[in-house]
């Protein structure tokens, strides 16, 4: 998606394909359970025993690798050390979040400076690095800083009212503590005395500065032990124990001291002066003030040379690390991971806190739960507002409602001053109807209103009115438009392509029917809200047109109201297309006339003229002919901007099997595959047994 991502991924994949596949013995069950491990290690066939092993793989320098290392030494086999990459995941590994990147080291491991590592060799060779690689590195660095990305990405930003954000704060020094048992300390030439020396030096060298010590949140609650907790009780020293996004913290200090923490390198990325007291992988190259006495020996033995920050970054993040495409599970690039983490980090921040779903059916709970499975969201289900009134709510509590929200829920939220989030199916939904219990691939979560309620601005309307759309949005929107139109993808993807095309020279107008008690009509079509009235009005305004009426699939399947008798339809329409796929009907239409139907948006994607008799989300931006004014939508949009806001920035997508977050392109690809598999079944009349079986499967996957 990013400028260099396709080229970089191609280079990585080509290099991997050239490798000869060998049998790799991996004793650790935990390593073997890493999702898509074979994709990360394409040169190996993974074995559970060492009978035919040609290499042995273990996890860094953990004590659990002693057996694997001993086996490799005994059988004179190469040992490969793996570790988490520097951009790993949204949440912690101990919380079940799999890695999207690993490092692969056939020499040592990067945090062990007692001997060489593959990363060290890559940095030493970085003086011959191609300019193209350095350009990629610069772009990646910029994106990481822009999106505040780190190894883990669940922590909140430094709050707006934090003293470190005060414009009148004095010079600020950050000292980074680490936890006992961190192997980077042991193998980085440090111990408790190193931390004491760092602390006293920082105080002595900065007598007028405010000193802040960043320690791990588990230290203060007693789960782990740090080195500086007691020392930090001194005057001028403030203890930071809360979880804070590292980049947002580092950007608000003036100077940083560390021993071996990876945050030290991130401080360099943020342009902060860094003083090191251990032997981290980034020390000794001339980019930091290094105080460890062994640095000189590393230089003298030619294990260090002068390198710049960009070269260090390129070696560590582009060459040393391997990546998955988190959307597909296939081999990916650094830019795939940056793009993905930036997206899911925004989602995690949006959903941060306690969310109470009130009065949802078991099915709706099963549908919703996977979309809120992010580290900082505490999703809770409760049967009624009466029960919620007896709950002691946290300061960050919000209520989550389906659609526009039942009146009792909305009233309760207003009376108790509790913020209300609303959710609804997304626009690329499924192969099959929601009323047939087919779960969605996408949901929208709106903290302002909901997209179909024209009575008040929604988050989608805010995005369309204010978003600074960029070139990435442009490219992705065009790609999505092409995928959806060429593969005939709509919201539900049901119906038959068996359609009698009109043989006429008249203007062909398609009138899509809607579910008449649907909220989009109640809140978005104040003048015309019945299908028959719409059909009559369209005929009155277009007496010479050829009109095709397409009933809504939920109405045809008998699940919802809005039926027009054949006799009434025939009075105003030249043709009724009951079973036909809506996109097939669109192919033969010159214009689409609608109250608020999503078909209007799908028609815009296909270059059709659209007339709106209500106020759908896509009306009022200069792309449609609107019968009703909506003055607050004052921006004139191009079609690609409407697509970007509606399909990229507003919804969330998940994989139907893994329930992992995916992007809009991957969701479209999944629907294309599903639709091709079901092309011989129109899917409107889903049998009772199929409904129940699908419901059971969804419930099991969501609550297991």
Curated annotation (Swiss-Prot):
It is found in: Cell inner membrane. Keywords: Cell inner membrane, Cell membrane, Membrane, Polysaccharide transport, Sugar transport, Transport. The keyword Nucleotide-binding does not apply. It holds the Pfam family Capsule_synth. CDD domains: beta_Kdo_transferase_KpsC_1, beta_Kdo_transferase_KpsC_2. Signal peptide: none annotated. Involved in the phospholipid modification of the capsular polysaccharide, a strong requirement for its translocation to the cell surface. This is Capsule polysaccharide modification protein LipA. It comes from Neisseria meningitidis serogroup B (strain ATCC BAA-335 / MC58). The lineage of its organism: Bacteria, Pseudomonadati, Pseudomonadota, Betaproteobacteria, Neisseriales.
């Amino acid at each position: 998606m990013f400028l260099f991502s396709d080229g970089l991924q191609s280079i990585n994949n080509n290099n991997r394909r050239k490798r000869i596949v060998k049998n790799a013995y991996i004793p650790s069950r935990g390593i073997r359970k890493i999702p898509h491990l074979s994709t990360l290690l394409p040169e190996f066939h993974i074995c559970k025993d060492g009978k035919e092993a040609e290499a042995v793989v273990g996890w860094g320098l953990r004590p659990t690798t002693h057996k694997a290392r001993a086996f490799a030494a005994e059988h004179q086999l190469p040992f490969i050390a793996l570790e988490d990459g520097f951009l790993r995941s949204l949440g912690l590994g101990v919380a079940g979040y799999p890695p999207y990147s690993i490092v692969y080291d056939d020499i040592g491991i990067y945090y062990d400076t007692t001997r060489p590592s593959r990363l060290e060799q890559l940095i030493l060779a970085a003086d011959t690095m191609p300019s193209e690689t350095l350009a990629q590195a610069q772009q990646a660095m910029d994106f990481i800083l822009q999106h505040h990305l780190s190894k883990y990405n669940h922590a909140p930003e430094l709050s707006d009212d934090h003293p470190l954000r005060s414009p009148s704060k004095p010079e600020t020094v950050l000292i980074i503590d680490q936890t006992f048992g961190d192997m980077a300390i042991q193998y980085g030439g440090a111990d408790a005395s190193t931390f004491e020396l760092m602390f006293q030096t920082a105080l002595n060298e900065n007598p007028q500065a405010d000193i802040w010590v960043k320690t791990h949140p588990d230290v203060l609650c007693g789960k782990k032990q740090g080195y500086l907790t007691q020392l930090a009780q001194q005057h001028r020293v403030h203890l930071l124990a809360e979880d804070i996004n590292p980049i947002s913290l580092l950007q608000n200090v003036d100077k940083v001291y560390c021993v071996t923490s990876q945050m030290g390198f991130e401080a360099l990325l943020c342009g902060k002066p860094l003083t090191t007291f251990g032997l981290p992988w980034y020390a000794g190259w001339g980019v930091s003030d290094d105080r460890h006495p062994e640095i000189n020996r590393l230089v003298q033995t030619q294990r260090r040379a002068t390198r710049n920050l960009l070269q260090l970054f390129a070696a560590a993040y582009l060459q040393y690390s391997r990546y998955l495409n988190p959307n597909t599970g296939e081999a990916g690039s650094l830019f795939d991971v940056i793009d993905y983490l930036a997206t899911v980090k925004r989602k995690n921040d949006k959903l941060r806190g306690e969310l109470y779903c009130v009065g949802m059916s078991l099915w709706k709970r099963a549908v919703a739960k996977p979309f809120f499975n992010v580290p900082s969201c505490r999703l809770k289900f409760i049967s009624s507002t009466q029960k919620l009134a007896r709950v002691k709510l946290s300061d960050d509590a919000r209520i989550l409602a389906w659609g526009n929200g039942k009146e009792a829920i909305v009233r309760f939220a207003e009376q108790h001053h509790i913020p209300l989030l609303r959710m609804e199916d997304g626009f690329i939904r499924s192969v099959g109807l929601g009323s047939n219990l087919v779960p969605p691939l996408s949901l929208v979560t709106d903290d302002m209103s909901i997209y179909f309620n024209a009575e008040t601005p929604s988050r989608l309307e805010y995005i369309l009115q204010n978003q600074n759309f960029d070139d990435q949005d442009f490219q992705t929107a065009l790609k999505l438009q092409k995928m959806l139109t060429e593969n005939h993808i709509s919201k539900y993807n049901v119906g038959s392509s068996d359609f009698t095309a009109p043989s006429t020279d008249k203007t062909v107008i398609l009138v899509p029917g809607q579910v008449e008690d649907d909220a989009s009509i109640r809140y978005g079509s104040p003048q015309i809200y019945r299908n028959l009235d719409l059909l009559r009005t369209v005929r009155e305004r277009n007496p010479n047109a050829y009109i095709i009426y397409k009933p809504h699939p939920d109405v045809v399947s008998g699940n919802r109201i809005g039926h027009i008798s054949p006799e009434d339809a025939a009075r105003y329409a030249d043709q009724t297309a009951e079973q036909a796929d809506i996109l097939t009907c669109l192919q033969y239409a010159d214009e689409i006339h609608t109250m608020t139907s999503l078909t209007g948006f799908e028609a815009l994607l296909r270059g059709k003229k659209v007339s709106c008799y209500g106020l759908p989300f896509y009306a009022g931006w200069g792309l449609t002919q609107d019968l009703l004014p909506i003055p607050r939508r004052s921006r004139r949009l191009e079609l690609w901007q409407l697509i970007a806001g509606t399909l990229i920035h507003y919804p969330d997508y998940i994989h139907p099997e893994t329930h992992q977050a995916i992007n809009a392109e991957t969701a479209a690809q999944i629907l294309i595959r599903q639709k091709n598999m079901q092309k011989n079944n129109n899917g409107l009349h889903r049998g009772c047994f199929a409904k129940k079986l699908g419901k059971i499967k969804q419930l099991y996957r969501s609550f297991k």
